[in-house]
Curated annotation (Swiss-Prot):
It is found in: Cell membrane. It catalyses: a quinone + NADH + 5 H(+)(in) = a quinol + NAD(+) + 4 H(+)(out). This is NADH-quinone oxidoreductase subunit B 1. Binds 1 [4Fe-4S] cluster. Its EC number is 7.1.1.-. NDH-1 is composed of 14 different subunits. Subunits NuoB, C, D, E, F, and G constitute the peripheral sector of the complex.
Length: 268
C-alpha cells in the first residue's frame, strides 16, 4: 500500500493524477450537490444565510439551489413540517432523481421541536422519507448546516457503486404519499403519527446508517384528546362545531375538572 502511495505522489509531481473510477465518480457527486429551493419555517432563514457571501456555500459546490425537484440532489427540510404540508414534501422527494439525499435541519424537522405535541405538526420527517443527516438546534446556525453538508460528503465518499440502491437498472423507490383520514395522516389506512400517547418508530431511518431504526422516539404516555380530532365533534361551518364539551377541553389541556360549590357562592 505504501508503494502505491509513493507512486501516486511521484506521478502527481509530473501532473498525473492516479485514482480509481469509484473515487473519481464519488468526487464528482460530492462536489456538485444541488439543493432544492425549499424552506418551511425559521430554519430556512439560516439556510438562506448559508448561501450568502459570509459563509459561502459555493465552496462546496452546493450553491445552485434549484426551483425544480427534478434538477435537485438534496432536500433540506428546513423547519416545521405540518401535517398539511407533509404530503407535498413526499411528492417533491419522489420527483427527485437518484441519487437523492435529505438533511433534516432543526429540531422541528427532526422530532417536531416545541410543537411535537400539537395536533397539526409531524413529529419527524423521517416518518415519511429517509434522512441522511440530522442537524439539532432551534434554529441551527449556518455553520451547523455546513457541517451537515461536509458529513454528507463523507457519506458519499464512502459509497460503493455496486452497493448503493440507485446503481444499475434498479427502479427508484416511490415512497407512499400520506392522505388525510378520520384521525390524521394515514398510509394504507394506518395512522402514521397519532396525536398523543403512542411511541413512534420510524420505518425508514436510523441516525447513523440510513437503515431500519431500532429505537423509539420519546413521547408522553398520557393520551391527549383534541376537539377537532374527537369522534363526537361535528363541524357545522368553518368556524363553528358542535359536540365540544367541557370534559373534552379538560382532557385536551390535562387539567383536572374543577367542581364549583354553588351553595358556598350563595352563602357569600
Amino acid at each position: 500500500m505504501s508503494d502505491d502511495r509513493e507512486i501516486q505522489l511521484e506521478a502527481e509531481k509530473h501532473g498525473v493524477f492516479l485514482t480509481t473510477m469509484q473515487r473519481f465518480y464519488n468526487w464528482g457527486r460530492r462536489s456538485s450537490i444541488w439543493p432544492l429551493s425549499f424552506g418551511l419555517a425559521c430554519c430556512a432563514i439560516e439556510m438562506m444565510a448559508t448561501g450568502l457571501a459570509r459563509f459561502d456555500l459555493a465552496r462546496f459546490g452546493a450553491e445552485m439551489f434549484r426551483a425544480s425537484p427534478r434538477q435537485a440532489d438534496l432536500m433540506i427540510v428546513a423547519g416545521t413540517v405540518t401535517k398539511k404540508m407533509a404530503p407535498q414534501v413526499v411528492r417533491l422527494y419522489n420527483q427527485m432523481p437518484e441519487p437523492r439525499y435529505v438533511i433534516s435541519m432543526g429540531a422541528c424537522a427532526t422530532s417536531g421541536g416545541p410543537f411535537r405535541d400539537g395536533y397539526n405538526v409531524l413529529r419527524g420527517i423521517d416518518l415519511l422519507i429517509p434522512v441522511d443527516v440530522y442537524i439539532p438546534g432551534c434554529p441551527p446556525r449556518p455553520e451547523a448546516l455546513l457541517h451537515a453538508l461536509m458529513t454528507l460528503q463523507k457519506q458519499i465518499d464512502a459509497q460503493r457503486l455496486n452497493q448503493v440502491r440507485w446503481y444499475g437498472k434498479r427502479e427508484a423507490k416511490e415512497y407512499p404519499v400520506p392522505t388525510f383520514g378520520k384521525h390524521g395522516l394515514e398510509i394504507d389506512g394506518k395512522l402514521i403519527d397519532p396525536v398523543g400517547g403512542l411511541p413512534l418508530v420510524s420505518p425508514y431511518t436510523s441516525p447513523t446508517h440510513g437503515e431500519m431504526r431500532s429505537g423509539m422516539i420519546e413521547h408522553p404516555e398520557l393520551v391527549r384528546h383534541f376537539p377537532i380530532m374527537d369522534e363526537t365533534v361535528e363541524r357545522e361551518s368553518p368556524y363553528k362545531a358542535t359536540g365540544i364539551a367541557i370534559e373534552i377541553a379538560h382532557n385536551d389541556l390535562k387539567r383536572p375538572a374543577v367542581e364549583v360549590d354553588h351553595a358556598e357562592d350563595e352563602r357569600r
